[in-house]
Each structure stands twice: as C-alpha cells, then as structure tokens.
Design a protein with these regions (language model features):
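Short, polar loop motifs at secondary-structure junctions
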Residues: 31-37, 107-110, 168-173, 230-240
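An aromatic- and histidine-rich active-site surface loop
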Residues: 38, 103-118
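Active-site-proximal region of nucleotide-activated glycan assembly enzymes
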Residues: 121-183
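Donor-nucleotide binding loops and adjacent catalytic segments primarily
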Residues: 185-192, 196-261
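Conserved nucleotide-sugar donor-binding subdomain of glycosyltransferases
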Residues: 65-102, 109-110
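Structural motif
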Residues: 101-102, 164, 202
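Conserved nucleotide-sugar phosphate-binding/catalytic loop shared by glycosyltransferases and other
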Residues: 3, 21-82
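A short, glycine/small-residue-rich beta-strand->loop->alpha-helix junction that serves as a flexible
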Residues: 1-13
Length: 261
C-alpha cells in the first residue's frame, strides 16, 4: 500500500472486510513509509493483519507544507536509491515467505519495480482511482503534455507485472481489455453503508497538507459565523484544535470523520 495516500489505506480496509467475508486469508500488509507522514492509528487498529513497513519514495512538502517541492523530492529520493533497492528485496522476500497467492497493490511504486526486477510468482492485481489515467476514454483537464505523460508513466510503473488494474470510479466506463483495465466503484467500508445520514450545518473536509489550515483560518476570519470541521494528520497536535466555537481541526480519525461526513 502506498502509505502517502490516506485514501489507499481506507480502500485497503474496505477490501479487507470484503475478502474476510468471502473466507480469504490476509497473510500480511506491506506499507510504504514516509518520514513526512505517520500511519494513522485507525488503520493500524482495524487492519487486523500483520503490518510490515518499508521505506518508499515520497514527495517532500515545501516549508509551509502546502505543496510538493519537486527539486527537494528528486534530490532526496536519488540519495536514497540504495534504501529503495533494499525495500524491493524486502517486498520480494515477504511475498515468498508468506506464500501469498495474490498480491493486491494500492498504487505503490516499489511493488511494480519488484515485479520488474525480481519477478515474484504471486499474481498481482492493482487497485486505485489513478488507473483511470490509463483508460482510453478518460478525459484529462487541460495541462502540460509533459505533466500528463509523467503521470501516466508513473502509474504504469506501479502496475508492472499486474494481470488486472481495477480503476476506481463513481462513473461507469467500459472495460479496456488491452490495458487490463476494469472500472469498478470505490470500495466502501460497511461502516459507511450502515451510517444513517442526518442534516448538518457545517463545512467538512480533509487537509492532505496541514499548511492549508492558514487558508482555512483566513476564510474563517471573513466568514466567522460558518461552522467548520476539518481533519488533518499534523504531527504533535492534540485530538482537537479548537480555534473558536465555529472552527475546529481534528486529528484524522475514521469514526469521527464518518460521523461528521
């Protein structure tokens, strides 16, 4: 699992529920770790399978933690190539030691490179919304040709050796057999399906980069009467940072997030 994306972690939890309900066994969960982020407690508590961490390439944020610093990220990852080779060998060893029949890859780059270099025998299936980028009918917003080519190239790297790519989408799209792409709905946990919606009177969201809290606070100063509850995974912060009666930042907690949603 690519540990950078909280969405990949929650999708893995959803898949776990479905697999266990069908009588399958999950022999291990490998997560690419990053010094910039920590694994949320809700994932570690609810995955209920052995979790193994390995060092994986990641994008470093700028000083204000609002966006990716491309130059810093490239230099950082180049200097750590020897560690990533160790991670590739570790992934291969864990696949063999657990005797897994199927490897499910949630957009982790090193899994694709493991299948390129060491060719594990276990069948691999990839799951992520990003595999829509490879679908022939997917229409991108206008942006640079180089950016699109880079994004598609990275996505293909994660799926090297896979027999199928499950592209998550709320919209129905045809299968693309030549690319091994099957479009499926997002994986929803049973807790979401069991939740009873009610009317709310606040804005709700998740900050991938905690630096954007500055923009939230700025908007709040202009609209002080609008209640807002935002979630982040900012290190060394308490469970709830209450700015005032109308603005709170919560540490990422899946149960609380679903309740507010």
């Amino acid at each position: 699992i690519q540990g950078e994306g909280r969405g990949h972690l929650t999708q893995a939890l959803s898949l776990r529920q479905k697999l266990m309900a069908e009588g399958h066994e999950i022999v291990g969960v490998l997560v690419g770790k990053s010094p910039a982020r920590r694994l949320p407690d809700f994932f570690l508590n609810k995955i209920q399978s052995p979790v193994y961490l390995f060092e994986s390439p990641n994008f470093l944020p700028t000083a204000k933690n609002k966006q990716v610093s491309l130059m810093r990220s490239v230099l950082y990852n180049v200097l750590r190539l020897h560690k990533y080779m160790g991670s590739i060998r570790y992934i291969d060893r864990m696949i063999r030691q657990t005797d897994a029949d199927v490897v499910v890859n949630f957009y982790e780059l090193l899994t694709g490179l493991t299948y390129l270099i060491l060719r594990p025998k276990a069948t691999m299936v990839c799951i992520a919304h990003q595999y829509l980028f490879l679908h022939p009918d997917f229409v991108f917003p206008k942006q640079s040709t180089l950016s699109l080519a880079s994004l598609r190239f990275f996505t293909r790297l994660t799926a090297i050796g896979s027999v199928k790519k499950l592209a998550l989408s709320f919209r129905k799209m045809r299968e693309a057999p030549l690319g091994g792409i099957v479009v499926v709905p997002p994986l929803l946990r049973q807790e979401v399906l069991d939740a009873v919606p009610s009317n709310g009177s606040y804005l709700h969201g998740y900050l991938l980069n905690s630096g954007f809290s500055e923009e939230i606070r700025s908007w709040h100063s202009r609209h002080p009467s609008v209640p807002m509850h935002f979630f982040w995974d900012k290190k060394d912060q308490r469970a709830e940072v209450k700015i005032d009666d109308c603005l709170s930042f919560h540490q990422l907690d899946d149960t609380l997030f679903l309740r507010y949603m």
